[in-house]
Design a protein with these regions (language model features):
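Basic, helix-initiating cap at the start of DNA-binding domains
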Residues: 1-36, 40-51, 65-66, 76
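Membrane-embedded alpha-helical bundles of multi-pass transporters/translocases
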Residues: 3, 43, 59, 89-90
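Short hydrophobic/aromatic patch on the recognition helix
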Residues: 50-61
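Alpha-helical DNA-contacting segments of helix-turn-helix folds
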Residues: 59, 70-75
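Hydrophobic alpha-helical connector segments
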Residues: 77-110
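Short alpha-helical scaffolding segments that buttress acidic/His motifs in well-ordered protein cores
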Residues: 92, 106-113, 150-158
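Amphipathic alpha-helical segments used for helix-helix packing
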Residues: 97-132
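Hydrophobic/aromatic-rich alpha-helical bundle segments in the mid-to-C-terminal region
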Residues: 119-124, 136-194
Length: 194
């Protein structure tokens, strides 16, 4: 008969399960927050979509707001800031177009604006994790102003394409709009090199 040694643990498997569970919850939350918003999404719905017990949402994230904040943290602009300034417009617009059916962080943020706590979390996140790093990367002159203008440009486009779809943003017109958005994005970036 084999008696297990207490030093032999199964923690790595449990840890992998915990990581997988946490990731499933975050994926489900991103999907629901970006299609329904914060106020219209329940913890039970997130858990059901993730295939887990709803108590695990509280265990991993503390609250629905904690889950929302963690979902925001999944959004990371820093990989986009590793590239060349001269091709940033093409690269960044490609990010928007490469997965058009995926749940989007912008939709999640906009649809969650009605809730005061989610609104505050979104504004804080946007400034700290998007505008400030983008401004620092753009550098002088007026990196913060240029970062804000890029955010305005991208937000306006994504709202018109995803949330309040303009019918003429399809087919060849969408391709032309993509080229325009790339050029406008690059023009704002290039203001610092003129």
């Amino acid at each position: 008969m084999y008696i297990s040694d207490p030093s032999e643990t199964k923690r790595p498997a449990r840890q992998r399960d915990a990581e997988r569970t946490r990731a499933a919850i975050l994926t489900a939350a991103l999907n629901l927050f970006s299609t329904r918003g914060f106020a219209q999404t329940g913890v039970r719905e997130v858990a059901e979509l993730a295939g887990v017990n709803s108590a695990l949402v509280g265990r991993y994230f503390g609250s629905k707001l904690g889950l929302y904040r963690a979902t925001l943290e999944v959004i990371d602009i820093t990989p986009a800031l590793q590239g060349d300034l001269r091709s940033f417009g093409k690269f960044m617009v490609g990010v928007f177009f490469d997965s058009p059916g995926a749940p989007g962080p912008l939709q999640m943020m906009i649809l969650s604006m009605a809730d005061p706590d989610a609104h505050a979390a979104t504004v804080e996140f946007l400034q700290k994790k998007v505008i400030t790093p983008l401004a620092r990367w753009l550098g002088p002159p007026d990196g913060e102003g240029r970062a804000a203008r890029l955010n305005i440009l991208w937000t306006g486009f994504l709202i018109s394409w995803k949330l309040l779809p303009i019918q003429s943003l399809t087919g060849a017109r969408l391709a032309a709009t993509r080229r325009w958005l790339e050029a406008q994005t690059q023009a704002i970036v290039d203001e610092g090199t003129a």
